[in-house]
């Protein structure tokens, strides 16, 4: 410690003439080491200014620039052997050099958490100090700035609106980087490997809100800005490899952070503190399927060591130490999630009014609601009574107070087609005490659809007019076609009026009198002709006495000699060439 005090005294005496406004070397292109969300930019170490002693002279060792960027316990692949690191707390030291180190260490810790870039100058400065750089001394403003930084560090670790534990008992920040100066964890060395950097969130205390911390921080910011003149001086932090004897020299790598950058970082910190609760709430709402995410919202518990819940919420996790061992039923998980959501909303002062009671599960509805059949339902509970599928926005049918999807309703309750036995979904034809699809109701004989004339039924089947009369209507005795309208009944047969005529000459019968021969109607002439009862002489029917000769029939007065025309009433005649002759005429003509 004596060597350290001597070293700090030398540093203060040799840097007393340096201006509080060093040159900002922003034009040099730095290169950086990516470390997660942080970027540290490292530049070659500038040569020592001639008046102050060099780093080698003070420490007696030669430092390799690459070794200077190997912080113990950091996330880089090559690690330095563990060595005791300086411990910085939020309490002020007596000496001004210690105050400077504490204040700068706290500022580096806060700035590192806010994900800003630290720049190191990469330009070889000349041995002669620039006129614009030189000034009388750091003065009282630098000491005032150190004091404000110490107070800011104390406020950040123990804000007035939230109770804070002492540095020795508080749990470590999750994933704090060892190159950043922080508070040791229960006397544990800071050389261990740390996790990823996570923003520190204040603890909740009862019903106090996050806005309770704003007045003190904003007043500190106003005091900080008023105490630092413009242009704002950069705070130079000598960062190098830490060994047992602490070595801090002006020739090592320098880190500068302006007051405007610190103000911007604190504004972003306050914005994140104000929003972290709503982000945690949204993450639980988005995790509506807890069995898929593996973290049910209801399993949120506080750490037994009193860990800050906000730190876990920043990583998108709840405060439970491990995921659940098994999966419960989706219904119980949904109920647990809704109950947790309701309680969280009540804690935030958000009044939620149930939109009704579900008609299936009889529980209040807090999210989407389906209104149907005079009731309210959870969307997942409004299902088809038969297939149990969610109806959603599809059409449904109600029967006996129960909802059915369109498919099951038609399958169960719709009328069936007599032809195909399928359910009738749209238009229906009712005929012959049965129901039919319109496209399946057609003539049983020809398959034609029925027109305006309708159909005729025979033996339980439907026929068109033509096929029905062709198959089942009475047939005409004359033309053998169906009789559709008027008809004549004669000879035990039905006849079309135009078909009831003489079957020989097709002459209609006068006064309805006709002669029947072999079941067919004839006129008188053709009737006697068919029977052979016509007079061979006059070709008229014989109604009375007749003479039969030469296989013919004659009226008595018409049976005469073919030459002299005398009546052959005696019954004697001569026949020649199918003609009758008397005896005398026959002798004269043929003898």
From Swiss-Prot:
Motif (LD motif 3): 216-228
Region spans: Disordered: 17-139, 156-261, 289-338
Modified positions (Phosphotyrosine) in chain numbering: 31, 88, 118, 181
CDD domains reported for this sequence: LIM1_Paxillin_like (cd09336), LIM2_Paxillin (cd09407), LIM3_Paxillin_like (cd09338), LIM4_Paxillin (cd09411)
Single GO BP term: lipopolysaccharide-mediated signaling pathway
Alphabetically ordered keywords of this record: Acetylation, Cell adhesion, Cell junction, Cytoplasm, Cytoskeleton, LIM domain, Metal-binding, Phosphoprotein, Repeat, Zinc
Annotated motif LD motif 5, positions: 333-345
Motif mapping: LD motif 2: 144-156
Limits of the LIM zinc-binding domain: 356-415, 416-473, 474-533, 534-591
Keyword Ribonucleoprotein: no
GO molecular function: BH4 domain binding; MAP-kinase scaffold activity; metal ion binding; neuropilin binding; signaling receptor complex adaptor activity
InterPro entries associated with the record: Paxillin_Lim_dom2, Paxillin_Lim_dom4, Paxillin_TGFB1I1_LIM_dom1, Znf_LIM
Segments of skewed composition (Low complexity): 89-99, 315-334
Localization (cell): Cytoplasm, Cytoskeleton; Cell junction, Focal adhesion; Cytoplasm, Cell cortex
Biased composition (Polar residues): 121-137, 236-261
Residues modified as N-acetylmethionine: 1
Ranges of Pro residues composition bias in the record: 45-54
Residue(s) carrying Phosphoserine: 83, 106, 119, 126, 130, 137, 140, 143, 230, 244, 250, 258, 261, 272, 303, 322, 332, 340, 533
Region (Required for binding to PARVA and ILK) location: 262-315
Pfam families with a match to the protein in the record: LIM (PF00412), Paxillin (PF03535)
Annotated motif LD motif 1, positions: 3-15
A Gene Ontology term for the protein's cellular component: cytoskeleton
Protein family (similarity comment): Belongs to the paxillin family.
Function field: Cytoskeletal protein involved in actin-membrane attachment at sites of cell adhesion to the extracellular matrix (focal adhesion). Recruits other proteins such as TRIM15 to focal adhesion.
Subunit structure: Interacts in vitro with VCL/vinculin as well as to the SH3 domain of SRC and, when tyrosine phosphorylated, to the SH2 domain of CRK. Interacts with GIT1. Interacts with NUDT16L1/SDOS. Interacts with PTK2/FAK1. Interacts with PTK2B/PYK2. Interacts with ASAP2. Interacts with unphosphorylated ITGA4. Interacts with RNF5. Interacts with PDCD10. Interacts with NEK3, the interaction is prolactin-dependent. Interacts with PTK6. Interacts with TGFB1I1. Interacts with SORBS1. Interacts with PARVB. Interacts (via LD motif 4) with PARVA/PARVIN. Interacts (via LD motif 4) with ILK.
Protein name as catalogued: Paxillin
Organism: Mus musculus
């Amino acid at each position: 410690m004596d060597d350290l005090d001597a070293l700090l005294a030398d540093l203060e005496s040799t840097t007393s003439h340096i201006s509080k406004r060093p040159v900002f070397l922003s034009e040099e292109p730095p290169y950086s080491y990516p470390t997660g969300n942080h970027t540290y930019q490292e530049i070659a170490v500038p040569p020592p200014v001639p008046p102050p002693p060099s780093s080698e002279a003070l420490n007696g060792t030669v430092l390799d620039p690459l070794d200077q960027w190997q912080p113990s316990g950091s996330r880089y692949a090559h690690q330095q052997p563990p060595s005791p690191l300086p411990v910085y707390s939020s309490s002020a030291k007596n000496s001004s050099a210690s105050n400077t180190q504490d204040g700068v260490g706290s500022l580096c810790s806060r700035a590192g958490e806010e994900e800003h870039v630290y720049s190191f100058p990469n330009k070889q400065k000349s041995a002669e100090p620039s006129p614009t750089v030189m000034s009388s001394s750091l003065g009282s403003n630098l000491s005032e700035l150190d004091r404000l930084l110490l107070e800011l560090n104390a406020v950040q670790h123990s804000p007035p609106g939230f109770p804070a534990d002492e540095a020795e008992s508080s749990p470590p920040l999750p994933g704090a980087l060892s190159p950043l100066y922080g508070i040791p964890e229960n006397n544990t060395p800071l050389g261990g490997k740390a996790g990823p950097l996570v923003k520190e969130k204040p603890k909740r205390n009862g019903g106090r809100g996050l806005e309770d911390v704003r007045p003190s921080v904003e007043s500190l910011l106003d005091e900080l800005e008023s105490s630092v003149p413009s242009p704002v001086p950069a705070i130079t932090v000598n960062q190098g490899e830490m060994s047992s004897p602490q070595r801090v020299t002006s020739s090592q790598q320098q880190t500068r952070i302006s007051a405007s950058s610190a103000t911007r970082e604190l504004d972003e910190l306050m914005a994140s503190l104000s929003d972290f609760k709503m982000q945690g709430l949204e993450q639980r709402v988005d995790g509506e399927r807890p069995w898929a995410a593996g973290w049910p919202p209801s399993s949120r518990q506080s750490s037994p060591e009193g860990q800050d819940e906000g730190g876990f919420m920043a990583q998108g996790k709840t405060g439970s130490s491990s995921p659940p061992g098994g999966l419960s039923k989706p219904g119980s998980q949904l109920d647990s999630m809704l109950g947790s959501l309701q309680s969280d909303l009540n804690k935030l002062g958000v009044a939620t009014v149930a939109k009704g009671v579900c008609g299936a599960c009889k529980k209040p509805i807090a999210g989407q609601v389906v209104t149907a059949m005079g009731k309210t339902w959870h969307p997942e509970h409004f299902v088809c009574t038969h297939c149990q599928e969610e109806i959603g926005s599809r059409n449904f049918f109600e029967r006996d107070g129960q909802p059915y999807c369109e498919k099951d309703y038609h399958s169960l309750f719709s009328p069936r087609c007599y032809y195909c036995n399928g359910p009738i979904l749209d238009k229906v034809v009712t005929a012959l005490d049965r129901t039919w699809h319109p496209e399946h109701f057609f003539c049983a004989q020809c398959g034609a659809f029925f027109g305006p004339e309708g159909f005729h039924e025979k033996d339980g089947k439907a026929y068109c007019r033509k096929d029905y009369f062709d198959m089942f209507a009475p047939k005409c005795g004359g033309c053998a076609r169906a009789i559709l309208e008027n008809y004549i009944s004669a000879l035990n047969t039905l006849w079309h009026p135009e078909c009831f005529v003489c079957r020989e000459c097709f002459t209609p019968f006068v006064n309805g009198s006709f002669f029947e021969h072999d079941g067919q109607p004839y006129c008188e002439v053709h009737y006697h002709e068919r029977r052979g009862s016509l007079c061979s002489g006059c070709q008229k029917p014989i109604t009375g006495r007749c003479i039969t000769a030469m296989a013919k029939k004659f009226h008595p007065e018409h049976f005469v000699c073919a030459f002299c025309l005398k009546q052959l009433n005696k019954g004697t005649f001569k026949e020649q060439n199918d003609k009758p002759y008397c005896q005398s005429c026959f002798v004269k003509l043929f003898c």
